[in-house]
């Protein structure tokens, strides 16, 4: 008969520390991508490595509620809460897109207590590039 294989320890008990290495980040960049359907907030360090991110969809908003200013405010608050715990004090904000959540996300970032060095609008604007799609007929 085959001998039973003894397991030493369980998978649950092996991981004691968190997988993410907690590092002090004094300065960062907050990217806000506000479309009409969703708002995505990404916090990176100055080199561009992602530290934290959140979107209206991950905060539990579904359908048309994802594009609302309140959803953007909630997403920005969730993304920033994690980096404030890691010691971020200063940040620059880059806002992209035409969505309703632009101002609400910026308001939530200001309320978080992080000092903002500047706020920049990086929405891509064509210099009369591609031809737009034909006009919708409803």
From Swiss-Prot:
It comes from Draba nemorosa (Woodland whitlowgrass). The gene is rps11. Part of the 30S ribosomal subunit. Keywords: Chloroplast, Plastid, Ribonucleoprotein, Ribosomal protein, RNA-binding, rRNA-binding. The lineage of its organism: Eukaryota, Viridiplantae, Streptophyta, Embryophyta, Tracheophyta. GO terms for molecular function: rRNA binding; structural constituent of ribosome. Residues 1-22 are annotated as: Disordered. It is found in: Plastid, Chloroplast. Belongs to the universal ribosomal protein uS11 family. This is Small ribosomal subunit protein uS11c. One of its GO terms (biological process) is translation. Residues 9-22 have a biased composition (Basic residues). GO terms for cellular component: chloroplast; ribonucleoprotein complex; ribosome. PROSITE patterns: RIBOSOMAL_S11. Its main location: plastid.
